[in-house]
Swiss-Prot record:
EC nos: 5.6.2.2
Identification of the protein by name: DNA gyrase subunit A
The protein's enzyme class: isomerase
Topo IIA-type catalytic domain mapped to chain residues: 32-499
Comment field (misc): Few gyrases are as efficient as E.coli at forming negative supercoils. Not all organisms have 2 type II topoisomerases; in organisms with a single type II topoisomerase this enzyme also has to decatenate newly replicated chromosomes.
Length: 814
């Protein structure tokens, strides 16, 4: 370029060309590893510089600053931090599966702690790293000028190890990126040996040896589909999960604990512990009492102590979903092949390594053959000298000078200049008989070596055999057991229920359609005849209509006055720890039509084929349908029963074919008949007569009447009693029934009736939202509800305020 000469250029072309030059520089000279030695330029330069400084595994450590300075000054004209960071990573046992640098000092931690400054740390090569540099002085690789043309540096290392797959690689170039996982050296050596013997083998054959990635931090890989995809195409997703187990009370001597001993690759342990603690503190994951990091020099150990009611599997499922206890490793096996970025599958990557090692051994053999032939040439001259010793000594003695002696030797004995010079350089002590035998022996050995090397170079199969021998040697010396376990079961997408612990809930629904759930433990047990606790601040003209107890995993079936059924999960109902919270409008959960309201709700744990759903209307109609018909209720609901005019559905229960049911009316009548009296009907059909009602009487409730149980009846005035099921005669359906409660003004009409046993507790709710939780029956009649005959009035079980009334009750088992 001539100074002062101005040449106009197109700015678009210049930017395009400059950016392309930059992109190719990043791709080829910075971000991507070479398929042959698996190294990026910065790693290659660090290892070569350390070898050049003599920092081998059996020498003393030297300051890291010295290494960084050597690399910067000779080979890598970039920032010192880039060189030091790359060297540090090669010394971290949680970053590389097989470390290449042996560091002394603080080289960082799995908690994300930074390493100490380079002036404080020391390093040397590991023994394994020496295998990457073996035979580099035997013309095995090409050298190129360094950045200022003052030195030469290798374009690739003659690595005896398949480093690309052994330690993996990651890097972001321009418009592309690589992310290759590490693998087990033993498996790689076995796979490459098999590939050499069976070059036409398929992916399945290779995967008999290479099971999958083997991360330095261990962990679990879920499923083989992602691995197979990555090995077949070069792209894939591998799901990695932490190794954790649940320690019971006998093991810990305290509460149950989840103990994490291995983390997914590249997960920051300190950040993980903080994340778990935050999720627990914000109540996004319940059941965790404390999180502790107990890691020490013996290994990693994170302890999650559970609360008494914490369910380990649900907590683990939540942690897998919301934290880095489960991560995805996205495989992109991109590497440089002949300085071009190429996505490789497993077989291609292994084949490139085999071809590279063939080239290295061939070049080494040619170098050694050339040296052996040169030495044989010298030894042939020395042999001639030994065979003509007296004549040669006499010739040298009478020669005018060394040049004359050399020329006469070459002329008289037909020697080359090198041979003649070697004879002149021969020490007198080499003329002894023993030394003569050494020269002859060395000559014979050299001839054998030449023959061997010539045969080796003429036979590629023997070169491949040497590749296998090298692999067997490195496998025996450096091979180890797999750290990452591969589980055959793939990733299971967590359903919402998998993340929610089983918990008993009180579900309430008001007349105006506000629904909520509250944990049952919010309500402490009380004696009968108490005033109860308020469970809701009802609005004016609103009151509690239904109350029931359900598990968070139960399906809540909601029945409407029009005979429709809706289904929601209990955990989908908003939960509030405040008893007095009003809840959410039911219309936000199910699409009720105008003037449609919920008239009954039940909780279902399983939708069995053998069980039936028995429904009843206020007018005394009953219907039996298979429960399994309602296992999948669409969001818009289903028609459960075709109702007579001016009738409405008031309740439903689950019963077996050999059981009996009982209907209870507001005026205190009841009928007890077999389920078998009701034929199984289709979902949208109508019902049959269950009980014949008199006057304005309506059905208040129904339940399954099991032997040894009691019929519990509670009135609007707060009166209640227990009556043995056996006191109710078994009748045929459609009769008028028998008396079950003597209704008078002070008791009020029957609000609800259910079948209970001694182990039950009941939660009785009033219209104003007051609830009392009381045992059904104990030996102490002052605490439990009294057992009485059918035609009695019962005793006070709750004292509702004036202008308040009992509306319903729910049963539960402690």
């Amino acid at each position: 370029m001539v100074i002062g000469n101005t040449r106009p250029i197109n700015i678009e072309d210049e930017m395009k060309n400059s950016y392309m030059d930059y992109a190719m520089s990043v791709i080829v000279s910075r971000a991507l590893p070479d398929v042959r030695d698996g190294l990026k330029p910065v790693h290659r330069r660090i290892l070569y510089a350390m070898s050049d400084l003599g920092m081998h595994y059996n020498t003393s450590y030297k300051k890291s600053a010295r290494i960084v300075g050597e690399v910067l000054g000779k080979y890598h004209p970039h920032g010192d931090s880039s060189v030091y960071d790359a060297m540090v990573r090669m010394a971290q046992n949680f970053s590389l599966r097989y470390m290449l640098v042996d560091g002394q000092g603080n080289f960082g931690s799995v908690d994300g702690d930074p390493p100490a400054a380079m002036r404080y740390t020391e390093a040397r090569l590991t023994r394994l790293a020496g295998e990457l540099l073996v035979d580099i002085d035997k013309d095995t690789v090409e050298f190129m000028p360094n950045f200022d043309d003052s030195l030469k540096e290798p374009t690739v290392l003659p690595s005896r190890l398949p480093v690309l797959l052994m330690n993996g690689a990651s890097g972001i170039a321009v418009g592309m990126a690589t992310n290759i996982p590490p693998h087990n050296l033993t498996e790689l050596c076995d796979a490459i040996s098999y590939l050499i013997d069976n070059p036409e083998c398929g992916l399945e054959d290779l995967m008999q040896f290479v099971k999958g990635p083997d991360f330095p931090t261990g962990g679990l890989i879920l499923g083989r589909d992602g691995i197979k995809s990555a090995y077949a195409t070069g792209h894939g997703k591998v799901v990695v999960r932490a190794r954790a187990h649940v320690a019971d009370v006998a093991e810990t001597g305290a509460r149950r604990q989840i103990i994490i001993s291995e983390l997914p690759y590249q997960v920051n342990k300190a950040d993980l512990v903080k994340r778990i603690a935050m999720l627990s503190r914000e109540r996004k994951i319940n059941g965790i009492a404390e999180v502790r990091d107990e890691s020490d020099r013996q290994g990693l150990r994170v302890v999650i102590e559970l609360k008494r009611d914490g369910e380990p599997q649900q907590i683990l499922n939540n942690l897998y979903k919301h934290t880095n206890l489960q991560t995805s490793f996205f495989v992109n096996m991109l590497a440089l092949v002949n300085n071009r970025p190429v996505v490789l599958n497993l077989k291609e990557a292994l084949n490139h390594y085999v071809a590279f090692r063939q080239e290295i051994i061939t070049r080494r053999s040619k170098f050694e053959l050339k040296a052996a032939r040169a030495r044989a040439h010298i030894l042939e001259g020395l042999k001639i000298a030994l065979d003509n010793l007296d004549a040669i000594i006499n010739l040298i003695r009478h020669a005018e000078n060394a040049d004359t002696a050399r020329r006469e030797l070459m002329s008289r004995f037909e020697l080359s200049q090198l041979q003649a010079q070697a004879i002149l350089d021969l020490q007198l002590r080499r003329l002894a008989n023993l030394e003569r035998q050494k020269i002859l022996g060395e000559y014979a050995d050299i001839l054998k070596q030449i023959s061997y090397l010539e045969d080796l170079l003429a036979n590629p199969r023997k070169v491949l055999s040497l590749v296998k021998d090298d692999l067997a040697e490195v496998k025996a010396r450096y091979g180890d057991a797999r750290r990452t376990e591969i589980q055959s079961q793939g990733v299971i997408e967590f359903r919402e229920e998998d993340l929610i612990p089983h918990q008993s809930m009180v579900v309430t629904l008001t007349e105006r359609g506000f629904i909520k759930r509250v944990p049952t433990e919010v309500y402490r047990l009380q004696h009968r005849a108490g005033r109860g606790k308020s469970i809701i601040k009802t609005r004016e003209a609103d009151s509690v209509r239904f109350i029931m107890v359900a598990d968070t995993h139960d399906s809540v079936l909601l029945f409407t006055n029009r005979g429709k059924i809706f289904s929601i999960k209990c955990h989908e109902i908003p939960c509030d720890l405040l008893r007095t919270a009003k809840g959410i409008a039911i219309i936000n959960l199910v699409p009720l039509a105008e003037n449609e309201r919920i008239t009954s709700m039940i909780a279902v744990s399983r939708f069995d084929e053998e069980t039936s759903l028995i429904m009843a209307t206020s007018g005394g109609e009953c219907k039996r349908t298979k429960l399994s018909d309602f296992a999948a209720v669409r969001s818009s609901g289903l028609l459960a029963m075709d109702l007579p005019k001016n009738d409405e559905l008031i309740g439903a229960v689950i019963a077996g074919a050999d059981e009996n049911i009982i209907l209870i009316t507001h005026n205190g009548r009841s009928i007890h008949f077999p389920v078998a009296d009701l034929r199984v009907s289709q979902r949208a059909s109508g019902g049959v007569r269950g009980i014949t009602l008199e006057g304005d009487d309506r059905v208040a409730g129904l339940d399954v009447a099991r032997p040894g149980h009691f019929v519990l009846v509670v009135t609007t005035g707060g009166y209640g009693k227990l009556t043995a099921v056996e006191e109710y005669p078994l009748q045929r359906r459609a009769g008028s029934g028998v008396l079950t409660f003597k209704v008078v003004d002070k008791t009020g009409k029957v609000a609800a009736g259910k079948v209970v046993d001694r182990e039950h507790q009941v939660m009785i709710a009033t219209a104003e939202g007051v609830v009392i939780r009381t045992p059904v029956g104990t030996e102490d009649q002052e605490k439990g509800i009294i057992v009485m005959g059918r035609s009695t009035q019962g005793v006070i079980v709750i004292r509702p305020d004036e202008n308040d009334r009992v509306v319903n009750f729910a049963t539960m088992v402690e």
